[in-house]
UniProtKB/Swiss-Prot annotation:
Database matches in Gene3D superfamilies: P-loop containing nucleotide triphosphate hydrolases
SUPFAM superfamilies the record matches: P-loop containing nucleoside triphosphate hydrolases
Classification lineage: Bacteria, Bacillati, Bacillota, Clostridia, Eubacteriales
Keywords assigned: 4Fe-4S, ATP-binding, Bacteriochlorophyll biosynthesis, Chlorophyll biosynthesis, Iron, Iron-sulfur, Magnesium, Metal-binding, Nucleotide-binding, Oxidoreductase, Photosynthesis
The protein's name: Light-independent protochlorophyllide reductase iron-sulfur ATP-binding protein
C-alpha cells in the first residue's frame, strides 16, 4: 500500500507522517517513509538525525545511478521504519518537484519500493505543482493534514483538486480522509470534510509534548516509552493506522471552487452560527 500525505507547509505533516509510520510498523508491517521536501527533515524523528539526501548521494556518485546501492539511500530508524529523504536543489534554483520524480524512478530502478508493505510519502503541498504531485501517480490513498483554520483548509482544497485531476488523467488514487492536527476546535474542519464528502480520520490536539518531540528528535511513541503523558495522542495514531490498514475504498473528493472556499465558512447555516435552525449532514467518520 502506498500512501501520500499532503498539507499546508508548517501544519505538521512530517510529525503526523512519522507517527503514522511508527504506528503502522508496530503492527508488524514493513514500512518505508519518503520525505519529499527540500528541507529534508521529514524523517528526523524516526532516524534521530538528518540523513543524507538522494540529491547528496547522487552528487557523491557523480550521478552514476548504476553505482548506487539500496543501502546508500535507505536508513533504518525507530521501530524498524526505513526512511529516505529526497532533498532538493539549492534555495532559489532548480525544481524540488523534479527531484521527487527522479527519486521515485531511482527507488523503482533499485527495486526498493517492492520490499515494503506500506510506503508513506511526506510531500510538500501548499499548492501542488506537477512535480510534487508525482506521488499521487503511485499512491493508492492520499491523506491531507490540516489545522482548523482557513489557510490550511484552502491548501487542503487545492490538494483535493489535484486528486480529482489525477483521477481524470487515469490514475486510481483516492482520498482516505483529512487528519486534524494542532486543533483546539474542529468546526471548520467538519464543515470542510462534509463539503468535500470525505472522512475526518482523526484529530490530534495542540500539545506541548508534540512540539517538543519534533525539536528533540523523538516520535510520540518513544516519548510514551519514556513515560511522557502522550497516550491519548498515540492512541489516536493507532486508530488512524488501523483505519488505513483496513484498506478503505477512499473517495474522489468533491473539491470546492476557489471562490466558493471564501464563502464556505461565512454562510449563515454553519453549525456554530445556528441562525436558521438547519442541521448539516454528519461528517463521515472513521469506524
Amino acid at each position: 500500500m502506498i500512501i501520500a500525505v499532503y498539507g499546508k507547509g508548517g501544519v505538521g505533516k512530517s510529525t503526523t507522517t512519522s507517527n503514522l509510520a511508527v504506528a503502522i510498523a508496530k503492527t508488524g508491517r514493513r514500512v518505508l517513509q519518503i520525505g519529499c521536501d527540500p528541507k529534508s527533515d521529514s524523517t528526523f524523528t524516526i532516524a534521530g538525525r538528518m540523513i543524507p539526501t538522494v540529491v547528496e548521494i547522487l552528487d557523491k556518485f557523480n550521478y552514476h545511478y548504476e553505482s548506487i546501492e539500496p543501502d546508500d539511500l535507505v536508513v533504518q530508524g525507530y521501530a524498524g521504519v526505513c526512511v529516505v529523504e529526497t532533498g532538493g536543489p539549492p534555495a532559489g534554483s532548480g525544481c524540488g518537484g523534479y527531484v521527487v520524480g527522479e527519486t521515485v524512478k531511482l527507488l523503482e530502478k533499485l527495486d526498493i519500493m517492492r520490499q515494503y508493505d506500506v510506503i508513506l510519502f511526506d510531500v510538500l503541498g501548499d499548492v501542488v505543482c506537477g512535480g510534487f504531485a508525482t506521488p499521487l501517480q503511485y499512491a493508492d490513498l492520499a491523506c491531507i493534514v490540516s489545522s482548523n483554520d482557513f489557510d490550511a483548509l484552502f491548501a487542503a482544497n487545492r490538494i483535493c483538486e489535484s486528486i480529482v485531476e489525477k483521477n481524470a488523467s487515469g490514475y486510481d488514487v483516492k482520498l482516505a480522509g483529512v487528519i486534524g492536527n494542532r486543533c483546539d476546535q474542529v468546526d471548520l474542519l467538519e464543515t470542510f470534510t462534509r463539503r468535500i464528502e470525505a472522512p475526518l480520520m482523526g484529530v490530534v490536539p495542540r500539545n506541548e509534548e508534540v512540539r517538543q518531540s519534533r525539536v528533540k528528535g523523538y516520535t510520540l511513541f518513544e516519548l510514551e516509552e519514556m513515560g511522557e503523558p502522550v497516550s491519548e495522542m498515540t492512541g489516536e495514531f493507532r486508530k488512524m493506522a488501523a483505519y488505513l490498514l483496513s484498506q478503505p475504498d477512499g473517495v474522489v473528493p468533491n473539491a470546492v471552487g476557489t471562490r466558493e472556499m471564501f464563502e464556505l465558512f461565512r454562510g449563515e447555516d454553519l453549525p456554530w452560527k445556528g441562525s436558521n435552525g438547519k442541521t448539516a449532514a454528519s461528517t463521515p467518520s472513521v469506524p
